[in-house]
Amino acid sequence: MLNSFIEQFISYLEIVRNFSINTLYNYKRDLNKLEIFLTKNKINSPESIKEHHIREFINKERRRGLSPKSLKRMLSSFRSFFNYLLEEGILKANPAHSVTSPKTSSTLPKAMDVDLVKKLLDFTPKGLFEIRDKAMAELMYSSGLRLSELCNLNLTDISVKERSCRVSGKGRKM
């Protein structure tokens, strides 16, 4: 029964909220893991899910070695899902609302090594694929694009005349 609500929620995120494929995948994976845990504990309806079930699941995942960052993302998925069920009138309270997220250390991205950047910029491509790969690496390095943003670029997004490209960022923002 919970699975049909999960599918509805994922469709809502895709169609109404316009979430990226990666985000949809992560939400679905997190919610499916929770559903398996709940089913094993004979909890089959959303109304039966209590705060202690969410805490128990998170603690189980922590003991399995999941990182605080992953646990935080999972809790965020659960809170969003239960808020959706609240809005749909299926639940009266969000069982994940009071579950505290684990503390995560904020880490800055690692800068590329100077020698590696020099090698990249000095590299002379020999064929079409190497020319393409060097152009992609230089674009990513010089503009700070995410890998997913680079992979989603189309030829129509690039203007050689204006020396610019149009990028759909995280959350499909331009």
List each language-model region with its residue ranges.
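Conserved catalytic core of the tyrosine transesterase superfamily
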Residues: 1-174
